[in-house]
């Protein structure tokens, strides 16, 4: 009986020691992790984005995905990757964040960064070095930014970023309407008057408040005259006169 009690006692001591060690390990793990996270924040404040990313990726790699702080780590990574223009990694983290945290209180920030990335990609830094009008280049990312910004403004009307989003949408609308106007002029030069009218009407529907859309009216008017559709041409002439479009 004594021997049996001794075995139980030894087992209890071993179990207690292992529990204490386990708790100590967990405490050290979270302390180390918190220290690293604080260090990454300091690097972000100093704008040492590469250093911050290195630390944050280390935390993310060794972190339990169920941990409550993972959202903060991912938001910081999105910001840091965006700032160093590593848009592929930024978008990868955005997609992960939106999948795991669709109802997060800062989801509007993440979606807004997504809009800014599309705008940055559209600006095409390579062509900005040369005397080339980037409006004539491919505008895939501009269209992305247009729809993303419209979605953002509709989905998050009370967001702190909505004012800037509206300003950016005006910029993108001007960008796209100027691009469409250059295409419209090409059609007009080649006497494709139906195409001019169709393109112009699309511009007026999407970007009616832009200068380029108003200029499109001049080419629409000339196209109707060229097609000998005089009644419509005269109506457009009156609109041009009233709005003082040149």
Swiss-Prot record:
A Gene Ontology BP annotation from the UniProt entry: protein insertion into membrane
InterPro entries (UniProt xref): BamD, BamD-like, TPR-like_helical_dom_sf
Membrane among keywords: yes
Record key words, sorted: Cell outer membrane, Membrane, Signal
Pfam families listed in its UniProt record: YfiO (PF13525)
Signal peptide (from-to): 1-22
Subcellular location: Cell outer membrane
Protein transport recorded as keyword: no
One cellular-component annotation, GO: cell outer membrane
Superkingdom of the source species: Bacteria
Family from the record: Belongs to the BamD family.
HAMAP family: OM_assembly_BamD (MF_00922)
Subunit structure: Part of the Bam complex.
Function summary: Part of the outer membrane protein assembly complex, which is involved in assembly and insertion of beta-barrel proteins into the outer membrane.
Name the record gives this protein: Outer membrane protein assembly factor BamD
Organism: Buchnera aphidicola subsp. Acyrthosiphon pisum (strain APS)
